[in-house]
Amino acid sequence: MRQKQLFRIFLFLLIFTFSKQTTVRAQQSTGQTVDVVFCLDLSSSANGLIDHLRNHLWDYWYFFSRCQPVPNYRIGVVAYSRFSYGKSNGYAKMIKDLGTDFEPLSNILYKIPSRIEKGDQYVGSALSTCLKKISWSKDPDAIKIIFLVGNGDVTLGAENIDRTMEKLSAQGVVIYPIYCTVPGERKTVRQWQRIAENSGGKLSTISIRNKYFDQLNGFDIKKFRTLNRKFNNTYLYYGQGGYKRWKMLNDEDNHVYITNTEGYRYRALYKISDDYQKKNASWDLVDLYYKNPVAFMDVDRKTLSDTCKKMKSDQLKAYIIYKKYERKKLSAMIADMIAEKEMKDKADGKIHEKTMGTLDIISIRTLRELLQAKQINCPTN
């Protein structure tokens, strides 16, 4: 009985804290502007690096969402060293400009092959792409950083890396190199150190082989996945591209479930948060109903699911309302399961600050230090 009472208190506090955070998030103009670009080496010497980002993308949302006050953050990705990106571009490409819609970003990242046989590493071209293609904030107080992740000789290619760094610095962009360790490359490590020194950043190192595994600690991940799938089925797609977006919702769940069950929980929290809820009126009938209760009558029935397209208007309205309340119920059940796990982990002493040298841990640690310097409280786990 006492354990149940403690759980209810813990759940109340969690919901109270979460609601406070979403209030701040809704007032984005008052938050600290943070632009983060991951500039990734996708050559053979960095095979597997892309997995470090895409498998932990939701870790970044989870980190930022628990900061107080919540920053006005955006994430973008530039990649280099793939021949498919074109010699004229220095084998570099902007994968996704700065933004907050992480689901399409995740979808794009999982389409990139993680391994190739070779590739030319033109770091200067990669940074030039960050300079010319990324829509950096004009806010003079913004934190604007590039996590330059890779290895090899930084002087290769036609771009003058020093001149490019000067132009980035003039825009207030700081480079934080993260070197992927390769035996016998002491000379190139010094080059990466020089980038950090000249840009005002700090050099870190990681091993791409490093991985950490989720501690389920008795958590019923299969039951959680079943709830999550039911939650996804409350989304009623419509319109041009509606089915594609609904499929993306499910695909990204499957991707992260296979690779990182901790990230799977973070993504579930994202989907029940104010960052996602009522934000999909362009393709979901339930969110459209929130926006305009009669707008569903004007949608093209041919774009609906087989179940919905056969319904009369009054039946479809009733079905939308049913799915609306089912979504609320499932959101609460998902939150309950996560809160119960967090309480159990805390009681069992399973909550620790992550220290392993992986891309997500190193970069989040850097972000924490930068935000704390701006008097923003950030989580340590």
Regions of interest found by a model, annotated:
Residues 30-144, 146-147, 155, 184-189:
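Von Willebrand factor
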Residues 30-45, 105-111, 171, 299-302, ...:
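Acidic/histidine-rich, surface-exposed loop or edge segments in extracytoplasmic proteins
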Residues 9-17:
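Bacterial N-terminal signal peptides
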Residues 42-46, 80-86, 114-117, 151-156, ...:
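Solvent-exposed loop/turn segments at secondary-structure junctions
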Residues 152-198:
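VWA/integrin I-like adhesion module and closely mimicked acidic/polar interface patches used
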Residues 41, 77, 127, 143-155, ...:
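DG-centered beta-turn motif at the end of beta-strands
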Residues 199, 203-295, 331-360:
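C-terminal "exit" segments of structured domains
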